[in-house]
Design a protein with these regions (language model features):
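Repeat-based scaffolding regions
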Residues: 1-297
Length: 297
């Protein structure tokens, strides 16, 4: 026998007006039994459950509505419902936060489908932070990967992914992301931040190429201790290839920076020998001319 929808709605409304919410819910349930995909009626049930203080029931009902809206392509409506769930949890039942930890990733997915990248990033950031707090580092890495995909030119997500890799002892992954972050920071003119990241990278792996970049940045900054810092980095490069012209050139600059002119000259002499032995005649002449100006004897 078909249900008289209008009659049921009127009966439910009368119960609501009398604040007999449980009776109203029973009426609405009759409509839902006839049509389990009736999102509007489910939403009314959730609202009444919330008014009654039956927050776990309200959350469960709202989640059903959110899923229906998502399936029906109503992303904005789904987002509103999922946000309502999060507000109820935060305000009334924080102990349910972990059980409904899947809501934030769902929100991120919906935001992304609408092109709302900044909102998606905020939701994913929350997920990653929660996972790290729970020491679920492998799962956090997957979320950080998504953040990097969504915001590839921002150095911060790369840095956070690098640190996440570091926590699980994935040196290769950490070094790659530290390298990317440092390069982006240097490109943005944030030299001091780039150097901090390069120091973290070199702590994980003595990479000659990155050590050279760090040395160049220290020498460009030119503060009192930067010459010594550059020398420390150039030792890595020198050990990897003691006859590399670029490394020798930076070594000469570093010695000059710390006031050791004699050592700078010795390094330039070695540069001249390397240039001569490798057939770089023009470079050899240039170095010799420079040496004759600074050390004619």
């Amino acid at each position: 026998m078909a249900i008289d929808r209008e009659k049921v709605l009127q009966a439910a409304q009368k119960y609501v007006e009398k604040k007999k919410y449980d009776k109203a819910i029973q009426e609405y349930q009759r409509l839902i039994q006839a049509d389990p995909n009736d999102a509007r009626t489910l939403l009314k049930v959730g609202d009444l459950q919330s008014k009654m203080g039956a927050y776990p029931d309200a959350i469960s009902t709202y989640e059903t509505v959110g899923k229906l809206y998502s399936q029906q392509g109503f992303a904005l409506k789904a987002i509103a419902v999922y946000k309502q769930i999060r507000e109820i949890i935060a305000k009334h039942v924080p102990q349910l936060e972990e059980r409904y930890g899947h809501i934030a990733p769902k929100l991120a997915e919906l935001y992304q489908s609408l092109g709302l990248t900044s909102d998606a990033l905020a939701a994913l950031d929350e997920v990653a932070t929660r996972l790290q707090r729970q020491q679920k580092d492998a799962e956090a890495i997957e979320v950080f990967r998504k953040i990097v995909e969504l915001d590839p030119t921002n150095p911060l997500p790369h840095l956070r992914l690098a640190e996440a890799f570091s926590r699980v002892k994935d040196v290769e992954g950490a070094v790659f992301e530290f390298k990317t972050a440092a390069s982006q920071l240097a490109g943005l003119g944030r030299r001091d931040d780039a150097l901090k990241v390069l120091e973290r990278l070199l702590h994980h792996q003595q990479d000659p190429e990155q050590a050279r970049i760090a040395a160049e940045l220290y020498l460009a900054r030119g503060q009192a201790a930067d010459g010594m810092q550059a020398l420390a980095k150039l030792q890595i490069c020198f050990q990897a290839n003691p006859r590399d012209i670029d490394t020798l050139g930076l070594l000469a600059r570093a010695f000059t920076t710390i006031g050791q002119a004699a050592k700078a000259i010795e390094v330039q002499k070695e540069m001249a020998r390397v240039a001569r032995d490798s057939g770089k005649t023009d470079l050899f002449r240039e170095i010799v001319e420079r040496l004759l100006r600074v050390a004619p004897h």
